[in-house]
């Protein structure tokens, strides 16, 4: 019974995280018209294309919303401040899975190992 509850919680956490990211883009302006939806749908079609998305651990500084999907969830662009040899700092971003997704996948592998 405990295993079933843990699996259900992990599934809900991963599902809510993957669905919340697309809803955030869509619900920014609640009073939208059909003219506003068409560019949004066109942009989503481009993002779904595997050839145009940014793979894991690749640079996404200039295009933060175009990370590829990994399984059921979409990776996020994470930014870091990097200092070079001269001491000048710059911001670098790379596509990576969120911490919640990493915990979910680790838990899933542990549960699979039990069976």
From Swiss-Prot:
| Pfam families referenced in this protein's UniProt entry, alphabetically | Toxin_35 (PF10530)
Tissue specificity is:
Expressed by the venom gland.
PROSITE patterns of this UniProt entry?
A: SPIDER_CSTX (PS60029)
Write the record's keywords in alphabetical order, separated by commas. Answer: Calcium channel impairing toxin, Disulfide bond, Ion channel impairing toxin, Knottin, Membrane, Neurotoxin, Secreted, Signal, Target cell membrane, Target membrane, Toxin, Voltage-gated calcium channel impairing toxin
Its predominant location is secreted
Complexes and interactors:
Monomer. Interacts with CSTX-13 (AC P83919) (Kd=370 nM), but does not interact with CSTX-1 (AC P81694).
Name recorded for this polypeptide: Toxin CSTX-9
What is the species listed in this Swiss-Prot or TrEMBL entry?
Cupiennius salei (American wandering spider)
């Amino acid at each position: 019974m405990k295993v079933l509850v843990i699996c259900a919680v992990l599934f809900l956490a991963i599902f809510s995280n993957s669905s919340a990211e697309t809803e955030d883009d869509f619900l920014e302006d609640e009073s939208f018209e059909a003219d506003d939806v068409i560019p949004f749908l066109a942009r989503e079609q481009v993002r779904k294309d595997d050839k145009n998305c940014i793979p894991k651990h690749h640079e996404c500084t200039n295009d933060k919303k175009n990370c590829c999907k990994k399984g059921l969830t979409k990776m996020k662009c994470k930014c870091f401040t990097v200092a070079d040899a001269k001491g000048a700092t710059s911001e670098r971003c790379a596509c990576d899975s969120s911490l919640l997704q990493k915990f979910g996948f680790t838990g899933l592998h542990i549960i699979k190992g039990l069976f």
